[in-house]
């Protein structure tokens, strides 16, 4: 029984772990939800959590990437890393001058709330408002979420 309790504590503590890094240099904006950051001689490939931006070859993909570049034009961000995805990218939330960049992408209509992975349900309010105001990708009433786009491309 003690072993099971210890295992549960270890699993929970590992799941809840997050690392906060400050003033990382932006090396590259890959697309609307992925960036490469530099800090202490390390390159971090970071996938923005809570959101899924259009793929580069998808309608609004370039717009989404360009918008993220504009948001990050000052060159340094803080990041809260909460894990690693199956591609080895760090999963994180970016902050620039106190602004939650992940949320800003949804507010501006350049990313969807990533239904399968969202933990902060308030992102849905931001998405509904962007849709209502027809911002960004919501200008097209038939826009396709990236997860559906990827699925269709595999077929």
Specify the residue positions occupied by each region the protein language model found.
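Small beta-barrel nucleic-acid-binding modules, primarily SNase/OB-fold domains
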Residues: 2-5, 14-155
